[in-house]
C-alpha cells in the first residue's frame, strides 16, 4: 500500500526527506489553521513587545531577559504566562519589564493588537507554535529565534524577523528591524494568515490533498 505524509512546515518535510527516500507525490505540507482571537492590529504606537508562553527553560524566557538588558530603557517587555520559572521572572522585573502572570487570552490579544511585536525566543524545536500563527492572524509581527519550525514560519511568511540565540547582535538587529519596518511586517503577517492559516484557506489545502490522494492525482 502507498503511504503518504502531511507535514506542518517545509522544515519538517526537509528533515523527513533526509531520513527517507520517498516520492515527492507522497509528501504534502499543510499548516494548522487558527481563528482570530482579537481585532486586526491597530498599529504600534510605542515600543512594546510581548512574550506569551509557558515560563520554562525551553521557551527561552531566561535568554530573553538577558538579551533585554542590551536594549534602550524605553523598549518595554510585557510577559504573560506561568510555569516553573515564575519566581525567576518576578526577580528580574525592571522598570521596562512588566510581568502579568497567567492572563485570559482576551487580555493578551488586546495587548498584542497594539504591540510592536510578539517575541518568541524558544531555544528548542517546536511542533507548530500556535501563538505565532495567532499573532499573525491579527497582524502582529513576530521576532523569533531561527530554530526549527518557528524560524521556518517567519522565513516563509515574512511576517517578522529572526535572530540567532547565541548571537546577541542579531537580536538587537531583529528588534530594530521590526520597529523600522513594522507596517510592512503587519501587512505580510495578515496576508500570510489569509493565504495560509485561515480556516477557509486551510480547508482548500486539505481538500486539495485528499483530491490528489483519492482522485487519482
Show which residues each predicted segment covers.
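Donor nucleotide-sugar binding/catalytic pocket of nucleotide-sugar-dependent glycosyltransferases
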Residues: 1-39
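Conserved donor-binding/catalytic core segment of Leloir-type glycosyltransferases
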Residues: 6, 32-34, 41-59, 65-69, ...
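Nucleotide-activated donor-binding/catalytic signature segment of Leloir-type glycosyltransferases, i.e.
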Residues: 88-106
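Conserved acidic donor-binding segment of nucleotide-sugar-dependent glycosyltransferases
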Residues: 101, 156-168, 177-183
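Short alpha-helical segment that forms part of, or immediately flanks, the ligand-binding pocket
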Residues: 109, 132-137, 151-152
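Acidic donor-binding loop of glycosyltransferase active sites
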Residues: 113-127, 140
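Short hydrophobic beta-strand element within catalytic cores of glycosyltransferases
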Residues: 132, 141-144
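A charged, aromatic-enriched C-terminal amphipathic alpha-helix characteristic of glycosyltransferases
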Residues: 183-214
Amino acid at each position: 500500500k502507498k503511504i503518504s505524509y502531511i507535514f506542518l512546515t517545509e522544515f519538517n518535510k526537509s528533515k523527513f526527506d533526509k531520513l527517507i527516500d520517498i516520492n515527492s507525490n507522497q509528501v504534502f505540507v499543510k499548516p494548522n489553521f487558527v481563528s482570530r482571537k482579537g481585532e486586526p492590529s491597530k498599529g504600534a504606537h510605542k515600543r512594546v513587545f510581548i512574550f506569551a508562553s509557558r515560563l520554562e527553560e525551553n521557551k527561552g524566557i531566561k535568554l530573553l531577559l538577558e538579551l533585554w538588558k542590551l536594549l534602550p530603557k524605553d523598549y518595554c517587555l510585557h510577559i504573560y504566562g506561568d510555569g516553573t520559572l515564575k519566581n525567576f521572572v518576578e526577580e528580574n522585573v525592571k522598570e521596562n519589564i512588566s510581568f502579568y502572570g497567567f492572563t485570559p487570552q482576551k487580555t493578551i490579544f488586546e495587548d498584542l493588537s497594539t504591540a510592536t511585536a510578539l517575541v518568541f525566543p524558544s531555544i528548542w524545536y517546536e511542533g507548530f507554535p500556535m501563538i505565532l500563527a495567532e499573532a499573525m492572524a491579527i497582524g502582529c509581527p513576530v521576532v523569533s529565534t531561527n530554530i526549527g519550525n518557528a524560524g521556518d514560519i517567519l522565513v516563509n511568511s515574512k511576517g517578522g524577523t529572526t535572530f540567532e540565540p547565541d548571537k546577541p547582535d542579531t537580536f538587537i538587529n531583529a528588534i530594530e528591524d521590526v520597529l523600522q519596518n513594522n507596517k510592512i511586517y503587519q501587512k505580510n503577517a495578515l496576508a500570510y494568515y489569509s493565504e495560509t492559516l485561515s480556516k477557509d484557506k486551510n480547508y482548500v489545502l486539505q481538500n486539495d490533498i485528499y483530491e490528489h490522494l483519492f482522485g487519482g492525482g
